[in-house]
């Protein structure tokens, strides 16, 4: 059953759907997101022949690439591109985390995003990419056309607007309709979930606040909820709102949120 949550703020937004790998701990706890080492503020530094932009938790950053393409970099994310970006005939970036890309059209210079074990190739379009450590990589297309392939160099899959591709740890690509009700909530400062799996909700919260996520019951992973809430509030406020839903018990301690049966 779907459970509705009253929210402090709601937003109509596009949503990126994503899939996370389950890591089962020694005590049977299912860890779906791990805390990472992040900078205290957004940084942009030269690293050899590359430029690296990194964001801390609970922060987004707008990046203008040399070709005029724009990237909205999500919380706890890292974007890397060569200092001579595009001069060799290919515009290529590497992403860890999540980002919204608005790519300037250039028929002579394809734009390629390397993320985890996935490669996304475009000429000019708007799309979201999500690829945190320990998770499957995914891309959602808003407009235009993209080709998605795994790092093993297999045949690419074409996406049409409103669809997503998910590449699992074996390199298999699954293409399906995206849950467009909440894909871009983070770009508008909102958590926006409509009949979404609790695992997906919690992993998004984990990536925003940079906290680990651990489920103490596998059955809770697939519980579906409606949850709209501002990202500007504290983690404690978000967990209180989730506890008010009554679907599970949410507790934070030692850098990790634990989700248990009530």
Spans of model-derived segments:
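A residue-level detector for the "anchor" residue at the start of short, highly conserved motifs
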Residues: 2-6, 11-262
